[in-house]
Amino acid sequence: MRKILKLKIGREDLILETGLLAKQANGAVLATYGGSTVLATVCCSDSIRENLDFVPLSVEYNEKYYAAGKIPGGFIKREGKPKDKEVLVSRLIDRPMRPLFDKRFGREIQVVPTTLSTDQMNPPDIVGMNAAFTAVFLSDIPFNGPIAAVRIAYLNDEFIVNPSFDEIQDSVLDIVVAGSLDGITMVEGGANEVSEEILLDAIDKAYAYIKQICDLQKEFIYLIGEREKLPLAYEEKVFEFKDDLRSLIYSELKDACFVRGKLNRDKAIKLVKQKAYEHFSSLEQINDENEILFYKACDDFEQEIVRKSILEDNLRTDGRTPTQIRDIIAEVDLLKRTHGSALFTRGETQALAVTTLGTSIDEQVMDDIDGDKRLNFMLHYNFPPFSVGETGRLMTGRREIGHGHLAQRSLEAMLPKKDDFPYTIRVVSEVLESNGSSSMATVCSGSMSLMAAGVPVKEQVAGIAMGLISNDDKYVILSDILGEEDHLGDMDFKVAGTKNGITGFQMDIKISNVTKQLMRDALEQARIGRMHILSIMDSVISSSRGDISVNAPKIVQLQIDIDKISLVIGSTGKTVKAITDEFEVRVQIEQDGRITLFGTDNLKMQKAKAKIESIVREPKVGEIYDGIVKKINSFGAFIELTPTKEGFLSNRSRSRDDRYGSDIRHSRYSNRNSRYGRDNRSSFSMRFPRLEEGQIVKVRISDIDKFGKIELELARD
């Protein structure tokens, strides 16, 4: 049965519809906001996998080109593998939703949001999030919903709910907030040095609308009736001999948890578990059915030890206090032939960032349903398996794309405008070691490598990952969390920014009682940590170098009148090709008359610039040129001043110097082979015997008539 509900959110109605499309799916919802429409479906498999310690959830957000009235570019006229944008939206949908599924369901779950229409004004990602959340909530799959999402922008000192693309572009804050009726579950966004209070107020603003959308979803239950949920695959079980296991390993496991060094600690913990496994195996108390339960019980003890130590003793597994940051080492210029490089090491996390400068030809062209774009800043994050001491495939996965995007957003607000710095910038982060917050290490190394490359960034940017350990009575905020603290904790909050404010952030919350005061405390602790990290980075490099790397391409720009573009190009591109060949530069001409020269030799580029300026320059009386004699006739000589300008040197003109004086003008030549017994040259050659075609001669413009014809006279050197 078709049901439709709507709610005013910002300037448009959010319309949710079910019962018309994709009725064979476990759940399907069509969501519309303005002219953007997304269909989200959810299905689960019939096969059951028992004793899983994770939710087998996959989210496959996809955009159809027909949604914007477009046909895919390229040779294959069909949508292909997911673009980075689709991967990022899939992660936005996945992260707040995953903790709300019951692991005991034991079936694979697939959520497929598909953009069917877009007005290129309202971003479809936020529409897809609410469509997906509602589809799962209305399905027969066990789910602890409802949840919803809202985007907030901050522009002209005002918060805008679900802003348009243009408003996002102009804003100083852009965040996506997801949450349930119990509280916030996810925040992600970028900013241009906003304060912590503005961020908190934006989250508050978003949450007010999130609760309204959650209530709207619950209205569907009253309209269509609550569906019977599919049964859980199994009841939660515990290891039968868990008490005996605790008595056997707890003390030894506690010691192992506080061994210094990630690899040593992991090895010590693994050894304790292995000894316990052998003990229970010898008693025939472990079998194929309860082996997973045995390891889960060991993990429960480990989590209990770590959390209890932090809550009661303010002691972390590596010996730090909650606010303490690991030792930091920062370096620049490690790689001599690159344009800029920096190494940032924080404890056992290490990121090498390399900046490469290119030309506008190197920009990434995005064929997108939201409109074609050209990106002149890219950050690529690589996380090879050796960074955690493992083997595996070298490939770019969703995690790498997501972490790279967060680091890119954190840095891009500090980059110069394209008109001021017309380079294409690519930063590559190679994570060489990882034990927590490698994306924030990427921000730090990336910021320093940009400065080392000579990119005139506005401010240094640093990042830090915050964590949370809490119980019913107390919470402890952790600065610079380890990988295990991320796994065992209640919150992962990454914050990047400058000394002036926040530029990037990402928060995932696993509990429901996170208050505004808690987030305020976390942001303040993050700010203090960020200032400490910035001070260390600034001691290595505190501002951009005055010049770009000698290994980077050089760029020279000039502006000409639009009607002069054809002069620079020349007939069939002859003129611009000659400039390219003569000066070894690459010339790019824009429709607005902006010309960009790319090359490696500054002197040749300046000469090429001067050449172009001479081509488009309007000649003036009295100017002197080194002209080329192109043609001689009986009346005088045609002199090429520039590839597009010629003047006429008459045989009646008089030089202002003595070089071509009377002895030359009145010279006579005899030619014995002449039919008339005298030289057969033109009278001009007789008067100016030193001039020959192809000769370079210095001339002065003596007159320009109303038709633009140029008269010349010989000039002094």
Swiss-Prot record:
Residues 553-612 form the KH domain. Its cofactor is Mg(2+). It catalyses: RNA(n+1) + phosphate = RNA(n) + a ribonucleoside 5'-diphosphate. Residues 654-666 have a biased composition (Basic and acidic residues). It comes from Borrelia duttonii (strain Ly). Its EC number is 2.7.7.8. This is Polyribonucleotide nucleotidyltransferase. Mg(2+) binds at D486, D492. Residues 650-681 are annotated as: Disordered. Belongs to the polyribonucleotide nucleotidyltransferase family. Involved in mRNA degradation. Catalyzes the phosphorolysis of single-stranded polyribonucleotides processively in the 3'- to 5'-direction. Its main location: cytoplasm. Keywords: Cytoplasm, Magnesium, Metal-binding, Nucleotidyltransferase, RNA-binding, Transferase. Residues 622-715 form the S1 motif domain.
